[in-house]
Amino acid sequence: MRITRRELFVLPAAGALAAAPSLVRYVRFLRGRTAAYGILDGETIRELRGSPFASPQPTGAVHKLSDVKLLYPCQPRKILAMALNYRSHLGDRQPPSRPELFWKPVSALQNPGDPIVIPPDAHNVHCEGELVLVIGRRVRNATTEQAREAIFGVTCGNDVSERDWQKGDIQWWRAKGADTFAPVGPVIVCGLDYGKLMLRTRLNGETIQEQSTADLIFDGPAIVRFASRYVTLEPGDLIFTGTPGTTRAMKPGDVVEVEIEGLGVLRNPVVAG
């Protein structure tokens, strides 16, 4: 699926506009059969040599956005995700006293525009729009300030979840980790104040989730600080920060969109496996 600039971006909220002049938008894309990183600038991508986390240099090549295929924007070694991080998603449960994290395998990653595949025996697969933190440096036992500095940028994510398996299985390995259950992208945005951005999830054009990231129970640095007590975080690692409100089941033929101000729109069709 080719994605245009108009499809990618919505303007950031007023509170985030102050950071706009220093924003950098990184993408990962296919040129022919080769994957590369680049900086998105209007309708063009300036190709980089190396990853955004290791002092990349421009190659001099420039590509039209419409001529390339966007991939999930980095290659993490690990993916963590937050449970119960908006009060609107708690139901009758009490707010957690500490960040509640779980794993999603890297094999669950899916590109912008590519399909979410529902396994044949899955009957209650929900979409969960989320802000995703991108780690930019190796960090262990971080202070709050070190945790803040370790967050390279942010992107959009969809924590696809099979609710029946969540309830029935001891572990969430398939409920949260089936192939294609972690669409991410389309860009990593650096320099944006992500503490007060409107997040919206749409299913077939209908808004089913809408809430500000200001309502997170645990903010980005708090999540990174807690996670780094137990797990060494490395450049490119991803942390989904939790989903707001209620969610809805998807079916083959649906299209789901996760939109966050300043970060663009992550759009994926849904197909049967």
Name what the model sees in each region.
Residues 134-136:
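Short, conserved beta-strand element in jelly-roll/cupin
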Residues 2-12, 17-99, 122, 171, ...:
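N-terminal non-catalytic cap/leader segment that marks the start of a structured domain
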Residues 129-131:
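Ligand-binding beta-strand-loop-alpha-helix segment within the catalytic cores
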Residues 2-4, 89, 163-273:
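Catalytic-pocket segment enriched in acidic/His residues
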Residues 95-112, 127, 257-261:
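Structural signature of FAD isoalloxazine-binding scaffolds in flavoprotein oxidoreductases
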Residues 69-71, 90-92, 116-125, 139-146, ...:
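A generic local secondary-structure boundary/capping motif
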Residues 93-99, 144-155:
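Short Gly/aromatic-enriched secondary-structure transition segments
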